């Protein structure tokens, strides 16, 4: 419906989620989350493209009748962006389905580059061209007439976010089975785990606006 209302300008987002919502709020097994997510993605893609009513009999979802109306304007489907922290499985999912991988780098472009270097290696592994439209990353940017005005406008929000919002109990960040062996082998950490690590070890995370800007978290 949104694609029709916008005249074919919808960009769909398929976030994988975090352990806090999927595992602890909804009681899902962390070992099967990725498989269940992939099944859901396939259901949505088929619903967008299949012109007739169909049945879906998956391992986790069974639907007798699936019939999307109104149908998306964009053919064969709207573009899909997958926001993610850092996992090999998310890279593979994006490359197999021609989705855009959007790295959620709360810790700025320097941290994002480390993750995206791994993503481009995965692109090579899949023998696909390094099209720049395959990837993006989150970067907080404050716009103002001057540097001082930007500090005056955004310091309170930035300091609150990095000083308070990213304090995550490490017990919630990585339940057993949530991170796969393949992801651990390449040394990747999600943004949630990274934030929890900072909280647990009381590292010198930037808490002043000046430190936050100097470390590239906010430009």
Regions found by a protein language model. Name each.
Residues 18-28, 96-97:
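Acidic/polar active-site rim loop that often engages polyanionic ligands
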Residues 6, 27, 31-38:
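Internal, well-ordered domain-core segments that constitute the primary functional module
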Residues 3-10, 92-97, 120-130:
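Acidic (Asp/Glu)-rich catalytic clusters
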Residues 86-116:
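A conserved active-site cap/scaffold subdomain adjacent to cofactor or substrate pockets
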Residues 33-69, 110-219:
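An alpha-helical appendage that flanks or caps ligand/catalytic pockets
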């Amino acid at each position: 419906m949104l694609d029709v209302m916008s005249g074919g300008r919808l960009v769909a987002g398929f976030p994988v989620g975090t352990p806090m919502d999927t595992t602890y709020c909804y009681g899902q097994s962390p070992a099967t989350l990725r498989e269940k997510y992939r099944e859901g993605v396939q259901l949505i893609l088929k619903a967008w493209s299949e012109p007739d009513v169909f049945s879906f009999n998956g391992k986790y979802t069974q639907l007798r009748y699936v019939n999307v109306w109104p149908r998306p304007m964009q053919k064969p489907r709207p573009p899909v962006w997958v926001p993610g922290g850092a996992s090999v499985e998310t890279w593979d999912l994006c490359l197999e389905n021609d989705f855009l991988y959007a790295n959620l780098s709360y810790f700025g472009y320097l941290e994002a580059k480390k993750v995206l270097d791994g993503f481009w290696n995965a692109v090579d592994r899949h023998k696909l061209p390094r099209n720049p439209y395959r990837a993006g990353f989150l970067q907080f940017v404050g716009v103002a007439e001057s540097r001082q005005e930007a500090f005056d406008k955004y310091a309170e929000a930035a300091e609150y976010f990095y000083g308070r919002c990213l304090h995550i109990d490490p017990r919630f960040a990585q339940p057993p089975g949530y991170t796969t062996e393949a992801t651990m082998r390449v040394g990747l950490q999600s943004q949630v785990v990274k934030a929890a690590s900072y909280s647990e070890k009381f590292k010198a995370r930037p808490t002043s606006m000046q430190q936050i800007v100097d470390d590239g978290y906010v430009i």
